UniProtKB/Swiss-Prot annotation:
Contributes to K(+)/H(+) antiport activity by supporting proton efflux to control proton extrusion and homeostasis in chloroplasts in a light-dependent manner to modulate photosynthesis. Prevents excessive induction of non-photochemical quenching (NPQ) under continuous-light conditions. Indirectly promotes efficient inorganic carbon uptake into chloroplasts. Its main location: plastid. This is Potassium/proton antiporter CemA. GO terms for cellular component: chloroplast inner membrane. Belongs to the CemA family. The keyword Transmembrane helix applies. Pfam families: CemA. It comes from Helianthus annuus. The chain crosses the membrane at residues 7-27, 107-127, 189-209. It is found in: Plastid, Chloroplast inner membrane.
């Protein structure tokens, strides 16, 4: 009976870890054909953000330059000019196709992530007992650690999140989230988030140390500051 009680929270923890991947894989396969059909048959207007509009405009400028070049090269044969027109036409169709697939990809990934979040929220509420047990295990594990190990772990975590080399890690993480939601890469937004998140986390950490750790374990705070200095 005791083994069963211990196994249930562990199974719940494993399911929490792998459930997002399962949900994402399942719903992407299920929704892909529906989203593609909806976009191709019912969407009559194309919405472009500044990044997409700039990219599309650059591509069409390149095609326009090729057309202008065609007018300048009158000495070429009619067959060559005809092949050039066909090539430009194919490139235009390919450009529209890529833009269409990118928009479908964005809708599909965004919808999948929203569904995944809703299911995980409901799953967490239903598994409240398992979460309480896992929380008690984590608290017991941390309580049995020495203050030196706690301070070292806290210092390692803070250096990874808000240390000197953390911006590159934040850039990769935010870029991955952006890509996972299907959004177009935007250097300005990513740079703004990279420069903002570590500052916010650093402020929260200092407040937590001041309000909580100073009251619960003053020795841990002393060791942490000694290692940090």
């Amino acid at each position: 009976m005791a083994k069963k009680k211990a196994f249930t929270p562990l199974l719940y923890l494993v399911s929490i870890v792998f459930l997002p991947w399962w949900i994402s894989l399942l719903f992407q396969k299920s929704l892909e054909s529906w989203v593609t059909n909806w976009w191709n048959t019912r969407q009559s207007e194309t919405f472009l953000n500044d990044i997409e509009e700039k990219s599309i405009l650059e591509k069409f400028i390149e095609l326009e330059e090729l057309l202008f070049l065609e007018e300048m090269i009158k000495e070429y044969s009619e067959t060559h000019l005809q092949n050039l027109r066909i090539g430009i036409h194919k490139e235009t169709i390919q450009l529209i196709k890529i833009q269409n697939e990118g928009r479908i990809h964005t809708i599909l990934h965004f919808s999948t992530n929203i569904i995944c979040f809703i299911i995980l929220s409901g799953y967490s509420i239903l598994g409240n007992k398992e979460l309480v047990i896992l929380n008690s295990w984590a608290q017991e594990f941390l309580y049995n650690l020495s203050d030196t190990i706690k301070a070292f772990s806290l210092l390692l975590l803070t250096d990874l999140c808000i240390g000197f080399h953390s911006p590159h890690g934040w850039e990769l993480m935010i870029g991955f989230v952006y890509k996972d939601f299907g959004f177009v890469h935007n250097d300005q937004i990513i740079s703004g988030l990279v420069s903002t998140f570590p500052v916010i986390l650093d402020t929260i950490l200092k407040y937590w140390i001041f309000r909580y750790l100073n009251r619960v374990s003053p020795s841990l705070v002393v060791i942490y500051h000694s290692m940090n200095d």
